[in-house]
Amino acid sequence: MERYSNSTREVAQDGRRGALMLSVSIKHPDAEAFIDAKMTEGKVTGANVSVKIDDEFMQCAVEGKPYTQQFPIDSKEPQFTKDVDAKALWEKIVHNAWKSAEPGVLFWDTITRESIPDCYADLGFRTVSTNPCGEIPLCPYDSCRLLSINLYSYVVNPFTPEAYFDFDLFKKHVFMAQRIMDDIVDLELEKIDAIMAKINTDPQNDEVKGTEYHLWEKIKKKSGMGRRTGVGITAEGDMIAAMGLRYGTQEATDFSVSVHKTLALTAYRSSVEMAKERGAFEVFDAKREENNPFLLRIKDADAELYADIMKYGRRNIACLTIAPTGTTSLMTQTTSGIEPVFLPVYKRRRKVNPNDEAVHVDYVDEVGDSFEEYIVYHKKFMTWMEVNGYDTTKKYTQEEIDHLVAKSPYYKATANDVDWLMKVKMQGAIQKWVDHSISVTVNLPNDVDEQLVNRLYVEAWRSGCKGCTIYRAAACGTILRCSP
């Protein structure tokens, strides 16, 4: 693990650092050592770690029964078996997540049961892990292609009593987004051809460059066979607020589900239409997929679409995801992914020269450096202020800011004070309409206990989430700071 982690830290491309997900099945006899791998400070810092947990283990943990680990984990005649206390091992997972934010949990039976690509497991599409942020469960050599649609941009008259969501425009754009993603697959294949051509002209002998060439061969084959895409969203939190709803309420969850259901049906319709024009993905077989739980939900919602899938196939083996969209949300100036706003208003500090006349020193640190504090407003909170007639240029006191937030739809709907259990239930409800997975972090205050983490993880499993991660403030030092 340390070697993989260090290798990832050493890799960079165009200023971007490497990313890595390490995962191990709870059924593996070394699972406990894996769970403890990041408890020592400075260890495995170049990777995210998650445990692949099956339904049998969860049931044993909840009921206090023993659980059998084995190696090989999928063998009918394993070389080694070991009975473990499932409840104690589960409590260790919970404790470590509470203390260090890792490991995350991947509910593996839910992932594989719901996975359309796993209908083709014997053809090389057996899911083995996820991409680094967990939003796309992947088979070997496949690619993680992401596109995010800004949900806030479809709210007409945001933050007013007349606010509504433009479903017609949304469906039009989702339909086009799926086509763009399919074009991106072709672009990727062209780039792979160029890479392989370059390898062929390299001066090294075939024995040296053969390993890299054959790796790209496998990636190209898998990408072309499945044409997997990842159409997703960002700005869910801002969309909910702009509609006059509060994140974490049942009303907001129901509305979000309707949006994601529309997205799923439209993206799949687009993929079917492309199958008619361009051909279905290479290994499509209606008989293999007809009883997949995700497709059966599509059948219940739109019988005609399901019938067309069975008749014409799809251009893409799977279409949807919800990524963290951290950088994307900076560009759109919105909340990220399906997350609530982290804080609508917060303070930042900038270092200043105390000898400058125009400077106001608000803080001096332990080494004597002077800082000026300034208020940062979430952009869509400022939009709410403008719509409701508040002066966005005024320098408000903290008391006035608290009063403004309390009157806004962001009140009690930030990362640290949202109803966390309801947030997990919302993730599970939306997951029913996302064929891949959803990357979510449940942010918690520093003073919560391990029992809450336990409740959240168990609820995530019961709600149908494919994975879950929690982050308790200051669990990993001072990565995040909140100032009153």
PLM features per residue range, with description:
Residues 1-2, 21-26, 41-48, 80-84, ...:
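Alpha-helix capping and helix-loop boundary segments enriched in small/acidic/polar residues
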Residues 1-171, 186-200, 215-222, 267, ...:
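Active-site cavity-forming subdomains of large catalytic enzyme subunits
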Residues 5, 9, 33, 148, ...:
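Contiguous, well-ordered alpha-helical segments that form the cores/surfaces of helical PPI scaffolds
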Residues 17-22, 30, 243-251, 437-440, ...:
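Glycine-rich phosphate/pyrophosphate-binding loops
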Residues 29-33, 57-58, 76-77, 104-106, ...:
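Flexible loop/turn segments at secondary-structure boundaries
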Residues 70-72, 173-220, 224, 246-325, ...:
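Internal maturation/activation junctions in enzymes
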Residues 134-136, 185-189, 295, 308-315, ...:
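Catalytic alpha/beta core of large soluble enzyme barrels
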Residues 228-246, 452-465:
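Hydrophobic/aromatic-rich, well-ordered segments within soluble, folded domains that form packed cores
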